[in-house]
Amino acid sequence: MMAQSKANGSHYALTAIGLGMLVLGVIMAMWNLVPGFSPADKPTSQGNKTEGGGGILKSKTFSVAYVLVGAGMMLLLLAICLSIRDKRRMRQSEELARIQQQAGTVPHSQEEDSQEEEEDVSSRYYVPSYEEVMNTGYPETRGQEQNPRLSISLPSYESLTGLDEATPTSTRAETETSPGHAPDRQNSKLAKRLKPLKVRRIKSEKLHLKDFRITLPDKNVPPPSIEPLTPPPLYDEVQAKAPDARPPD
């Protein structure tokens, strides 16, 4: 801005000087050309001497006027040329600034577009690893791998009750409705294999505690007498019938 203001000031100064010299030269030329204003046209007592001196003075004034007019024209042309040059430089600097701004914005937009395209391609052709595929259905094992201390700590009561509630009761209903139907050994073996060891151990311990609470004997009630389900074998009758069953001699 300072350089531009200085250049404008120099242009104005050259223009003013050129115009002043041009106007002064024109005035001097008009002074000699218009009759009555020149000293040669004024009447004097000395005739020949004044005529010769007036002609010399007239020629000198004309030469000075021509020099002033020429210098003024040159200064004006110089001021015009300098102003045109400065305007061209300003335009070139503005164009360079625009080009730099466009060059700065275009690569940024191209980088954003390229990043978006790469993200789209990676999301389309993304292949999960073996560990991710194997750990998707087993979040508990993943948590144990991340925190090895969890394997040492015991499960909470809420988790145990949730496991009991989450177990399906369809198998119990089937066994109650069809008591005579024998269970399939293969299905039971597969169920035992598929069940985790921890859950099976916790369930067995809880069932044992429940049965113990149910069958807890009272102090006032006498202990129940245990009777066999089937009657004892009749050994006496078999021994008595044995000699009769022998064939006669």
UniProtKB/Swiss-Prot annotation:
Any Pfam family hit: TMEM51
GO cellular component terms, A-Z: membrane
Keyword Phosphoprotein attached: yes
Residue ranges of the region described as Disordered: 95-126, 161-199, 213-249
Location within or outside the cell: Membrane
Membrane topology according to the record: Multi-pass membrane protein
Sequence ranges of Polar residues compositional bias: 99-108, 167-178
Domain of life: Eukaryota
Modified residues (Phosphoserine): S109, S114, S178, S188
Residue ranges with Basic residues bias: 190-199
Pro residues: bias regions: 220-234
Record's keyword annotation contains Coiled coil: no
Residues spanning the membrane: 17-37, 64-84
InterPro entries: TMEM51 (IPR029265)
Keyword terms: Membrane, Phosphoprotein, Transmembrane, Transmembrane helix
PANTHER family assigned: TRANSMEMBRANE PROTEIN 51 (PTHR16015:SF0)
Name listed for the protein in its UniProt record: Transmembrane protein 51
UniProt organism field: Mus musculus
Organism lineage string: Eukaryota, Metazoa, Chordata, Craniata, Vertebrata
